[in-house]
Curated annotation (Swiss-Prot):
The gene is matK. Pfam families: Intron_maturas2, MatK_N. GO terms for cellular component: chloroplast. The lineage of its organism: Eukaryota, Viridiplantae, Streptophyta, Embryophyta, Tracheophyta. This is Maturase K. It is found in: Plastid, Chloroplast.
């Protein structure tokens, strides 16, 4: 790792980074194994060659040689029983080399970003682009805005677009050819043709490789916001120079002037709205503004034309809806978000006259999506589709403590993730489902009924393991009661929830 850093540190001022020779280095694949990238498939093959679960540059060289010399007609034949090395086929070839390729490709981008911040001595302005800024945006900004547009960042229409994006950053022809080989190999696989899904979601074996490509793609799509912010507010963003700088980017902007009435400077007034906010979590993004509906339509038109003209992305403009916040709810980060208006009447007395003043206060609400969450529990066999708890036969062979610990951990994870919700009714229902499902699983193991089991051990026996997180924290760190304590405990955002997505991962 230090050798790689020294190499890129010397060459960081040049755009060309020749990373192809690193694919033949042993420590690259040891580093990839350290990150737990497909270790089982790779090291299962190493055992067949007698290398005792160790990476070898000789194996890598053989793989690359066979990738260039292989006959696809022979590989497509089902001869996995005759030769396990060939039997792994494309999985072995692509996964083994692409896992090291992904690690190598991440290093120059991360180092360029770090060196750029050090050279320009930027004050913490880049933290505004951190994913942790989503929570302050929800609490402080969203309730003061009027319109919101939920945008799903489109996937690239052609794989060559991904290669062209990296080509402007890393001008290493062998690495780009290898990347092109990986992408077309995955695209031509039978599993991808059957599923008819995007290449970013087709493979579960090499998530790091496709996650890196997707992040580069999303970063490229978001570059327009960095450019407009830099031109409008003169915010010097160093990451714009190192990561977002592309070949002929300003030429693309000049060509875009034709769409915006041939005068780019005069159209910047549309983007100087200080109340325009953009946030993104994974592939979903929100564009919110305090301006009028017409201004939001201009932003929508601009993004659609920009993505289609310069990135060849079809974003389906008919699916980008502009809604008013006070009468619309939307899903984001597995939450159901909304802004409600609470009306209240205040009587004012002045001398002998009294006035009745109607006030309207906007309140930001975060709700737990009940139906999707119950559907997730039903898929995991904790309840049926109607939310009625059922036993978990797969856990009946475990010990009682393991079963209770398993159910308690699931509820605590759910409670931890949805600690930012305004109302806890759905969490109480989830707690009831898991608690009764745990009791029925234990009763099935002991050949009894759930009622008899709870009567024998008592309800507090399960309550101890299904205790809410706030109650655990209050026992560890007792707090004195205060008028603001009630409002504080209603909604708590934990920063580590960004690492998981409840509705996309199995419980």
């Amino acid at each position: 790792m230090e050798e790689l850093q020294r190499y890129f540190e010397i060459d960081r001022f040049r755009q060309q980074c020749f990373i192809y020779p690193f694919l033949f280095q042993e420590y690259i694949y040891a580093l990839a194994h350290y990150y737990a990238l497909n270790g089982s498939i790779f090291y299962e093959t190493m055992e067949n060659f007698g290398y005792d679960n160790k990476s070898s540059s000789l194996i890598v060289k053989r793989l690359i040689t066979r990738m260039h010399r292989q006959n696809r007609l022979i590989i497509s034949i089902n001869d996995s029983n005759q030769n396990r090395f060939i039997g792994h086929g494309k999985n072995l070839y692509t996964q083994t080399v692409s896992e090291g390729f992904a690690v190598i490709m991440e290093i120059p981008f991360s180092l360029q970003l770090v060196f750029s911040f050090e050279e320009k001595e930027i004050t913490k302005s880049h933290n505004l682009r951190s994913i942790h800024s989503i929570f302050p945006f929800f609490e402080d900004k969203l309730s003061h805005l009027n319109h919101v547009s939920h945008i799903l960042i489109p996937y690239p229409a052609h794989l060559e677009i991904l290669v062209q994006i990296l080509r402007s950053c890393i001008q290493d022809a062998p690495s780009l050819h290898l990347l092109r080989f990986f992408l077309h190999d995955y695209q031509n696989s039978n599993s991808l043709k059957a599923r008819k899904k995007s290449i970013f979601v087709c493979s579960k074996e090499n998530r790091r490789f496709f996650l890196f490509l997707y992040n580069i793609h999303v970063y490229e799509c978001e570059s327009v916001f960095v450019f407009l912010r830099k031109q409008s507010f003169h915010l010097r963003s160093t990451s714009f120079r190192t990561v977002l700088e592309r070949t002929h980017f300003y030429g693309k902007i000049e060509h875009l002037v034709v769409v915006l009435r041939n005068d780019f400077q005069k159209t910047l007034w549309m983007f100087k709205d200080p109340f325009m906010h953009y946030v993104r979590y994974q592939g979903n993004s929100l564009l919110a503004s305090k301006g009028t509906h017409l201004r939001m339509k201009k932003w929508k038109s601009y993004l659609v034309h920009f993505w289609q003209s310069h990135f060849y992305l079809w974003s389906q403009p008919n699916r980008i809806h502009i809604n008013q916040l006070y009468n619309h709810s939307f899903y984001f980060m597995s939450y159901l978000l909304s802004v409600r208006q609470n009306s209240s009447a205040v009587r004012s007395q002045m001398l002998e006259n009294s006035f009745l003043i109607d006030t309207s206060i906007k309140k930001f609400e975060t709700l737990v999506p009940t139906i999707p969450l119950i559907g997730l529990l039903a898929k995991a066999k904790f309840c049926n589709v109607f939310g009625h708890p059922i036993s978990k036969p797969a856990r009946a062979d475990s010990s009682d403590s393991d079963i209770i610990s398993r159910f308690g951990r699931i509820y605590r994870n759910l409670s931890h993730y949805y600690s930012g919700s305004s109302k806890k009714q759905t969490l109480y229902r989830i707690k009831y489902i898991l608690r009764l499902s745990c009791a029925r699983t234990l009763a099935r193991k002991h050949k009894s009924t759930a009622r008899a089991f709870l009567k024998e051990l008592g309800s507090p026996f399960l309550e101890e393991f299904l205790m809410e997180e706030e109650q655990v924290l209050s026992l560890i760190f007792p707090r004195t009661p205060s008028p603001s304590y009630r409002s504080h405990r209603e909604r708590i955002w934990f920063l580590d929830i960004i690492c998981i997505n409840i509705l996309t991962n199995h419980v």
